[in-house]
Structures are given as structure tokens and as C-alpha cells.
Amino acid sequence: KGGYPVDSKGCKISCVINNEYCSRDCTSGYCYFLRWGLACWCDGVPPQR
């Protein structure tokens, strides 16, 4: 399933135009531009811990 991975506080994980960073916890991921900045978008989002 695709989506924005979140941290332990429920905040989207931000990135700085670095797809490798986004892919470390997902099947594949990339930096995606949002109104407020950049966040990781992932295919294969891991379940929340």
C-alpha cells in the first residue's frame, strides 16, 4: 500500500530531495513536494510500530 510514513508522533517524515533516504524503510520511496515542504512518499509502507 502507498502512503506517507510517519514517525512515532504521527508526523510525516520530511526529506531533502533524497529518494535513497525515503527508500530505507519502504519497498520504494521518493521525496514528494507538499504545500509545506517535502515529505517521503512510499510504496510498501511498513505497519506502524
Curated annotation (Swiss-Prot):
Entry's InterPro entries? LCN-type_CS_alpha_beta_dom (IPR044062), Scorpion_toxin-like (IPR003614), Scorpion_toxin-like_sf (IPR036574), Scorpion_toxinL (IPR018218), Scorpion_toxinL/defensin (IPR002061)
Report which superkingdom the organism of origin falls in. Eukaryota
Q: Which Pfam families match?
A: Toxin_3
GO molecular function term, any single one: sodium channel inhibitor activity
**One of the protein's GO biological processes:** defense response
User: Which UniProt keywords are listed?
Assistant: Disulfide bond, Ion channel impairing toxin, Neurotoxin, Secreted, Toxin, Voltage-gated sodium channel impairing toxin
One Gene Ontology cellular component: extracellular space
Predominant place of localization: secreted
Expression sites (tissue/organ): Expressed by the venom gland.
> What subcellular locations does the record give?
Secreted
The SS bond pairs are 15-31, 22-40, 26-42
Q: Which family does it belong to?
A: Belongs to the long (4 C-C) scorpion toxin superfamily. Sodium channel inhibitor family. Beta subfamily.
Reported function: Beta toxins bind voltage-independently at site-4 of sodium channels (Nav) and shift the voltage of activation toward more negative potentials thereby affecting sodium channel activation and promoting spontaneous and repetitive firing. This toxin acts on X.laevis Nav1.6/SCN8A and insect BgNav1 channels, and also displays a small but significant effect on X.laevis Nav1.4/SCN4A channels. In mice induces nociception (licking and lifting behaviors) during the first 15 minutes after injection, and increases the release of TNF-alpha in J774.1 cells.
Domain text: Has the structural arrangement of an alpha-helix connected to antiparallel beta-sheets by disulfide bonds (CS-alpha/beta).
- From the Swiss-Prot or TrEMBL record, give the protein name: Beta-toxin Rc1
Q: Which organism is it from?
A: Rhopalurus crassicauda
